[in-house]
Amino acid sequence: MDTITIRKGLLTNFFEGYDAAETLWDQVATKVPSTAASEDYGWLGSVPRLREMDGERIPQKLMEYTYTLKNKEFEASIEVRHADLKDDQTGKYGPLVRSIGESAKTYPDELVFGSLLPNGFTNLAYDGQYFFDTDHPVGNTGSTFSNKGTAALDATSFNVARVALLKAKDDFGRPVNQGADLRLIIPVDLLSAAEALLEAEFLAGGANNVNYKKASIVVSPWLTDTNNWYLINAQGVIKPFIVQEREFIPFEALEEGSSENWWRKKNYYGTYWRGNAGYGLFQKAYGALVA
């Protein structure tokens, strides 16, 4: 089998895995294209709303924040003996390359659920406060906003979180969450508790469950703490997290005809992603750090 045929077969395998993969990150994060080495998000929280125009326009002065996401490089690559590929005709390596395609599509899940969420209690948001904190300043209004709790997941703590999100304000003191598309983000260990809270139509005694379907359950295996839980409002253009993409090369090959192949008789295949993930609007996320 010639090199071009092998490459086409592996490319097909890659996109079979990529297209079939299901992701969770896009439920809670906004994908933003990047055109430079880094992108500035100092405008978060200060997007002006429409007002009645009485004479001249009145440009809103935005709060000055410093929040920048620098792009990083990520890759996944394999080394294959050229002779093995020709003998195998991609049968053995097809599943491996499909797995790389799956990994390429789902990698932002690891960034969002494996890093941003659990570290939100110690990582800073655009306002210089911890992303999950008890005293986020609301612009220059003099008031503060808390999106952090410490109570275990139950009906009471869930409703504290839900009310907090619905009452969240932007820098101008106006509601951020004018609608609610709530997602309860949990580790696998809290699945039974979450299902009892949100998916049981009736309580154990037979009374109606007032929290029935008040939020969708999102279970992430990347969350390793067994007690912490999160409530996200996924409504709106700007979500609590940002996935920034500068460049994506789905499938690259270094094979027959290259100097590396001439010396070692080995082919190299891989995928490349340049980007990053960071924090968006903390007003749309609530985190419970349970002792």
Predicted regions and their residues:
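Peripheral peptide segments
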Residues: A20, D26, Q60, Y67-L69, ...
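An acidic- and aromatic-residue-enriched active-site/binding cleft used to recognize and process polar
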Residues: S46, T66, R81-L85, K105, ...
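Sequence/fold signature of self-assembling virion shell proteins
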Residues: D2-I4, T134-R174, Q178-R183, D189-A291
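Long, hydrophobic/aromatic-enriched structural stretches that serve as scaffold segments
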Residues: R51-S103
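N-terminal catalytic cores of peptidoglycan-degrading enzymes
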Residues: M1-S38, Q244-P250, L254-G257
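Residue-level signal for secondary-structure boundary elements
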Residues: D19-D26, P33-A36, K105, V112, ...
